[in-house]
A protein has these predicted regions:
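Short, conserved loop-to-beta-strand elements that form functional interface hotspots
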Residues: 65-70, 74, 80-110
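Mid-sequence acidic-hydrophobic segments that form the walls
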Residues: 52, 85, 89, 123
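RNase III-family endoribonuclease catalytic core
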Residues: 1-79, 90
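Short, intrinsically disordered/low-complexity patches at protein termini
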Residues: 43, 100, 122-123
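C-terminal edge-of-domain segments
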Residues: 110-125
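Surface-exposed beta-strand edges and their flanking turn/coil or helix-capping segments
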Residues: 1-3, 81-83, 112-114
């Protein structure tokens, strides 16, 4: 249902970065009303977001910790590759990138397989 490739984890990381720097959210920077962002890679958007934040004074991302809440798919086996990809963009050591997965045990929209929630924190300098 997303305008870009709708990678919910990377979108949450982008929003956290922008929020930490007081720069709004991804919808302000990459509006879904602008066709140049239609089907764009979320990795590319993360790169652009990181550049925006660096121009605003971000020195580095010290660590991040995000939880993906969905019934399916089971994601834990994907985490090493996901962490490597995030590290490549943000320059943070893989050891400082923590990803977790949880379910709602069948409850709510996540439990019915209708959507995914991502919560997290990011520490920046």
């Amino acid at each position: 249902l997303g305008h870009s490739d709708a990678d919910v984890l990377l979108h949450a990381i982008m929003d956290a970065l922008l929020g930490a720097m007081g720069l709004g959210d991804i919808g302000m920077h990459f509006p879904d009303t602008d066709n140049q962002y239609k089907d764009i890679s979320s990795v590319e958007l993360l790169k652009r977001t990181f550049e925006i934040c660096k121009k605003a004074g971000l020195k580095n991302v010290i660590n991040l910790d995000f939880t993906i809440i969905c019934q399916k798919p089971k994601l834990i086996g994907c985490f090493p590759e996901m962490k490597k990809n995030i590290s490549a963009v943000l320059g943070s050591p893989v050891e400082r990138i923590n990803l977790k997965a949880s379910t709602t045990e069948g409850l709510g929209f996540e439990g019915r397989g209708e959507g995914i929630t991502v919560n997290g924190v990011i520490l920046v300098e």
